[in-house]
Amino acid sequence: MSEELAQGPKESPPAPRAGPREVWKKGGRLLSVLLAVNVLLLACTLISGGAFNKVAVYDTDVFALLTAMMLLATLWILFYLLRTVRCPCAVPYRDAHAGPIWLRGGLVLFGICTLIMDVFKTGYYSSFFECQSAIKILHPLIQAVFVIIQTYFLWVSAKDCVHVHLDLTWCGLMFTLTTNLAIWMAAVVDESVHQSHSYSSSHSNASHARLISDQHADNPVGGDSCLCSTAVCQIFQQGYFYLYPFNIEYSLFASTMLYVMWKNVGRFLASTPGHSHTPTPVSLFRETFFAGPVLGLLLFVVGLAVFIIYEVQVSGDGSRTRQALVIYYSFNIVCLGLTTLVSLSGSIIYRFDRRAMDHHKNPTRTLDVALLMGAALGQYAISYYSIVAVVAGTPQDLLAGLNLTHALLMIAQHTFQNMFIIESLHRGPPGAEPHSTHPKEPCQDLTFTNLDALHTLSACPPNPGLVSPSPSDQREAVAIVSTPRSQWRRQCLKDISLFLLLCNVILWIMPAFGARPHFSNTVEVDFYGYSLWAVIVNICLPFGIFYRMHAVSSLLEVYVLS
């Protein structure tokens, strides 16, 4: 000890040579986050203020802000496409996990529906141009241009890991993300106000009050000339309200892809970052029992019929409304119960699955898990409020029992489905066996599941029962070493994924296109009061709707990776 003190402190050994160093990201990211927070709070203030008649903020102010934001975001996207990516070594890496084909395909589909909605909006506001501000006609036109440019940008650049113009790219991506969130909030608020006025009209024998109130707010002296009285105007009005769900999903899909791009700015990737999202075209639609797709399609068709019956009967007299609610709750209880059991069975199958876990850094998967867990909170909140209202405040009749069962199954279904999806996303691809800590194990205890494993026989001790396969009989060897149990598990997981996917699609369609049993069933309205219950539903339900569509995207990925 004394000799060491006399010699003085030893020099630390030189650090090993590392790869290219990443630039310090905290400054640019912090600036972009602060920019997004401030812009989002401003947009949220105007949008929420414009939803109330007593607040002196008009919808024209909201349209003006959204139009300005879309113009600025479009200018930055054009700068990125025409200048940033054309710099030398601007995109040295591309993230294979980001922007899978089904996510970009869904973005294009929802973008097309958003363009149709913009056409309907333009036609609707042009029907009484003399009573409207010019910004109401300019806004859908600018939005159409923004959707076209942004969709192309995300299609070609979703996988980019940019290494030039870092601060500008961080701020531009975050501002574009904020623009999409502001558009989403405006659409959600507009649809919620429309639903609230529809409920008020059905309970007060008044006419459709929302359009009239908006028109008189814009031009109090306009008189009857501002009424949407023509058949074409009515078609435009109903059309763009029914297309709002697609606009909402487009904004959320774009926001998730922009966030992954923001995380990938300045990122260095290893040469083998784990499994890819790209499936083989041969195995994409094979190796299923077809029980899951058939049962899922059956529930989908029945769900559409139930939804149509509900929409037709719920606005009738008391007995027809009660009958519609019983049919609606009964179908949802069956669907939620089956999806809960199927999700639980999928998690049980994973207990016998020997595929290795994928621990590589993956911003896309991290975001998927966070969105699944966060979006489920909205439906959790509605369900717990319903449970309290049913247990504490109503007589126990058939409708109350169905409502309580529906709320409990909704909680269970979200919980077990999230467990199944999250565990599936963290599994490696088929054939990825977990690495053993003892590399030299007896060969008789191994089961090989791919061709590469056959070439590792030389590292094992000689065994008379195993022979080195020749190229001519490799196909026969694969048939010998492939275990039927693993094949059976893969088929079950594919069927489970397809069944859950189809069920989540119909469970998305019902609330997204106007099914509101929360207000038709007066249990919660009587217990909490309409004002409080409307706030709870209008805040939480959009997250529940988004959960369904995001679960569809994740389940499609689970199906491909199974």
From Swiss-Prot:
Protein's cellular compartments = Cell membrane
Residue stretches spanning the membrane: 30-50, 62-82, 100-120, 137-157, 169-189, 241-261, 289-309, 324-344, 371-391, 402-422, 495-515, 527-547
List the GO cellular component terms.
membrane; plasma membrane
Q: How does it sit in the membrane?
A: Multi-pass membrane protein
Q: What is the effect of changing A392V?
A: In a colorectal cancer sample; somatic mutation
Q: Which family does it belong to?
A: Belongs to the otopetrin family.
- In UniProt terms, what function does this protein have? Proton-selective ion channel open at neutral pH. Actives at neutral and alkaline extracellular pH, likely participates in some alkali-related physiological activities.
Return the protein name: Proton channel OTOP2
The organism encoding this protein is Homo sapiens
Q: Which gene encodes it?
A: OTOP2
